[in-house]
Amino acid sequence: MRRLSAILPILLLSNFWPTVESLNYKCHNDQILVVQSFGNDTIRMHCQRLDLCGYQKLKCDYDELQPQCGGKLNFVSHVNQKGSTAPVEHTCCNLFNPRSHHSIPTHIGNDCFIYELPDGSSNGKKVDPAPADDAPYAVLKNPAEIPEQFDGVTGYRLRLFLLKNKSPPTLLVKGIERRLDGYRVTICRPRCTSYDKVVNDNEGAEDGEWKAISWSSWSSSSWSTWARHAFNKAAAEGGEAAERIRTRMPIGEKTVAGAAGATGAAGSDKSNINIHVESNGNNNNSFEGGRSSSEKSDGQLNREISGSSEAGAGGKGGAGADGAAGSGAGAGAGAGTNGNINITVHTDGKSGGNAVAVANANVTVNGAGGVSTTGTGAQTGNESGLGGSAGTDKAGGKKGGHGDSGDSGNNKNKDNGKGKGKGKNDEEDEEDNGDEDGNGKGGNGGNPKGEWDDGDGDEDDDGTDGGSKESGNNGKGKGKGSGDGDGNRNGNGDGNGRPKGDGNIKINIHSPDDNDLLEKDENGPNGKGGAGNGNGDGDKDNNGKGNGTGDGDGDGNGNGNGLTGDGNGTGDGDNNESGNGNGDGSDKNSGAGAGTKPENREGGDGNGNGTGDGNGDGNDNGNGSKGLGTGSGDGKGEGNKSGTPGKSDGKEDGAGSNGSGNGKEGDGNKSGGSGKGGAGNGKSGDGSGDGKNNGNGGTGDGKDKNGKGSGSGDNDKSGTRAAGKGNAEGNGKGNGNDGKGSGSGDGSGAGGKGDKSDSESGNEADGKDGKKNEGAGGEAAAGSGGANKGGSDGDDDDVDVTDVEVGTKPLTGTKLEELLAKLPNETADGNATGDGNEFGTVQTGAKHNAESSASGIPLVQARSNTVNGGAPVPPAPGSGATGSGTSGSGTSESVTNGSGATESGSTGSGTTGTGTSGTGSSGTGASAARTSSIAGDAPQAAVLADTPGAAGAAGGGRSNCFSADSLVTTVTGQKRMDELQIGDYVLVPSSGNVLKYEKVEMFYHREPKTRTNFVVLYTKSGRKLSLTGRHLLPVAECSQVEQYTMNPDGIDVAMRESKYAEKARKGECVLSIDESGEVIADEIVRVGRMTNVGIYSPMTVEGSLIVDGVLSSCFSHLESHSAHKLIFDFIYYVYNAFGLLNTNHVDLQPIPTFVSFAQYLSKTVLPFS
């Protein structure tokens, strides 16, 4: 007891001791720590995404465990302190611009100060500031803006607050340092300027400005000990300290370090130099004659070389370089010969001679032309221009540069190539500037003297070895530089005659503010090119010998035929010319046989014996032109006789010249090949080709063109042609190709919808004129066409099945089939009747339709004959002998549509396209019925997006949320769903039609990498909402939704009446937010489908939120918002009571087990099943 009485006073006193809590702030999603306000021993901070100097949506590159965040664009994002006295660790956000150029040129620095928060343990003692001159931190000059000190400080508060306003941030945290007496917080204000000022301002820093307050030069952790007098001293004394803390200048600004030295060119005989010289360093290409002896200045931000002007003497003349940085420009030049160069040079030196020296060139310096230098050079400044004298042929490359022109070859008569090695500092090293071989072994015979000749082997030279240097030709091109000389043309020529050119390079080099660089003019008369790609020797003089096997373009293509080649070849010619020997040559030489040439192309006149078949040649001895088919021997073959007839798949024209009938799908050797629809789809097709499905044309229309055959259907009746209300001719999608080889009575098909957009159109006895047993002939694709879309003018309820990868691109053809093949297959195979339709159609039997009629969702075969609910895809030819025979309009089978109503074929209703088993007189070519896109159930019929198995409409998938690119409104602006975090405040609807911000308490479901299908709702106001089919959405008839908006508790009622999004229909309404923030009834104008990656379902206390401007529920799986709300409230209170709520960032959140269990119970027990 005595001990307890002694301890009790100590415990009571300890309650009055100040306590210091550790710091732990975190800003996610590219947000940084922003100071909202400070003063009175308190700093208020919040997280915000930074808009810096006019640049928005900047991104963070995070560096963890940093003692502070040094750098111009480096700011604090996370703060962590393990204990109240432990050092503070930072996660720094290095901001960058994710868009092009990836910089923020208008941000030129930061003005920073230090704010100290004394520890509360000082117990009211006044904290005396350090003397001003020795203060270890800097303060701004205006005390009214930021107080320099505080009196009577007894404690501190460093707090994180939510953003209350949207004013742009001006104070950013650079670091928080724990000291013995409290915290020291470094705060910076970004300094911005205009873009034009950044680009054009070449002035230095103003006197008296604190250069070091730009944090761009911080490279060490000594930031906390920098003092103001150090800044002033550095600015005054310059030198090394100033260099250490100087402000980094933006790209484009010049410093006072001096003018950049221009580069010099080392020249020699026939040194083909492309020069772009500007002494201010704005040239993007450079080469030099000397070695740099000083460091680059800050102005030299490109790739210039500020070499000394100790120019290396090249073979007969090298050009010197400008002086080193800061010393002006000096140049030395030697005389050269045969260097055909046109150069314009702009210099901008601030001291020195600004001399320019180029070997034997046409030079324009700053607008004045005619400058020619021969070994004279100004020598000014630092190692500038030791004036290269006129070098001899074997002058060593003293202090050689990059050797871009292969100067100073060791051999007197060898041309210079493009040497690659950097020169060495050894004067005796004669191989510095490129290889001794210099790219050519001294050839002759090619370009005339004085023409441009770069040793690359890509000109039309041909020299044969051993030429003189004066003729300016290339040798065989074995140099070790990058030139590959053509030599004897034994290499592989291009085949295509290169433009010959005039041998001169014209170079335009403009002032520093001009972006035009080198322009090489190679336009000249077309040369003859090489003699093919093979080993043929043909050359530009038409002299070719020997045998070759290549084919080229230009002069002679074929092998062995140069232009007057006399070898044997087997290739094809080109350009309307013929060659000698066997095979097709070119260039106007007749061969051993006579031939005809086609239309100025594709093979010259063949001579002698052609050997190819398939593409190109006709029969054995025919000089055929190129055929276009792919079967063996299926060309036009305008040879002696008719060419071999087209085999299995002739593509454009049928068989030989005696054949007729140009069908695109020729069936072998029938005369003309069978047409596609009576006459074929090809060009004319006047033969007696077969009809599409064994009918001989009939009197109706073919698939594309008109067939002129006289074949008839079963009873050769043209039918009544009773069309739907639209398309009176009955020639297409839904109104029946009625007369297409009609069978008995030519049943007019199931009619079509015609012009109306609802499922009732096309019912006006369109098909009643046919007798009930006439199913064999007529209709063709019409009955099923009517079922699919209801005529070309019908309406498919705007249901889009969209591309799997892109997400919004409507599909057609086989792409749709690929997509649908990935979806659940819940019906039987469509080919129940008839072997003629092999595409796979829908079998909408009574069993399946009855099964789906309970929920109003028709089942759709995964592979359908419709594209976007539109025109029918033509089935494969049937096996019958007469009639068009795809499906009649007979009543042999009745089917039930999605609404439970039964339609028979005789009524011609455009709803389900019946007549699935009508047979022709001698064939079964039947087409199964196709399910239409009726207004009521088409969206579910198009894609059952969330049904994982064969459970039909009652099934449910696990992916029932919003897409990743959906937008929600937060207190700081709009966020994508994949950027939303627990703790964010989002805009939600509430009672009284009032909108408010609610906290995201948890994620009901979050799977960023899961791919699933989404329903996309497009509204009249322009909103677009993407959510899974089993997500709850308040949607109803527009009149009802209008009532919701006028009733004070309308939003609550609408949420309770939410239903699955997949049940939304065109013409119904959702609740949206207009531009003024009012809740309105917004009509759905289109229902689409898409696939995307990422599913997200955030939860708020209200159980609802606004996504993409549309009011939506947070729940899915159970079609009852109220039941979900009860479940969520239960889970929330349990989690909250036991401390299980996760307040940290969540990457992956599966559906809660309790929700899955409730979904299971809902099928049998719960009232909302």
UniProtKB/Swiss-Prot annotation:
Q: In which tissues is it expressed?
A: Transiently expressed in head cells.
| Signal peptide span | 1-22
Which GO BP terms apply? Answer: cell-cell signaling; intein-mediated protein splicing; molting cycle, collagen and cuticulin-based cuticle; nematode larval development; nematode male tail mating organ morphogenesis; protein autoprocessing
Q: What CDD domains does the record point to? A: Hint
UniProt-listed InterPro entries: Dev_Signal_Hedgehog-like, Hedgehog, Hedgehog_Hint, Hint_dom_C, Hint_dom_N, Hint_dom_sf, Intein_N
Compositional bias annotation for Low complexity: 278-292, 889-906, 924-933
* Comp. bias intervals (Acidic residues): 426-437, 453-464, 793-803
Regions of biased composition (Gly residues) lie at 312-337, 526-536, 545-572, 605-634, 656-700, 727-752, 775-791, 907-923
Task: Report residue spans for region: Disordered.
Answer: 261-338, 368-933
Instruction: Give residue spans, biased composition: Polar residues.
Output: 840-855
**Which UniProt keywords are listed?**
Cytoplasmic vesicle, Developmental protein, Extracellular matrix, Secreted, Signal
* Compositional bias segments (type: Basic and acidic residues): 511-523, 753-774
Output a single Gene Ontology CC term carried by this record: extracellular region
Compartments it resides in: Cytoplasmic vesicle; Secreted; Secreted, Extracellular space, Extracellular matrix
Q: Name one Pfam family in it.
A: Hint
Task of the protein: Required for cuticle shedding and normal alae morphology and localization, and subsequently larval development.
Could you identify this protein by its name? Protein qua-1
Q: Identify the taxonomic lineage of the organism of origin.
A: Eukaryota, Metazoa, Ecdysozoa, Nematoda, Chromadorea
Gene giving rise to this polypeptide: qua-1
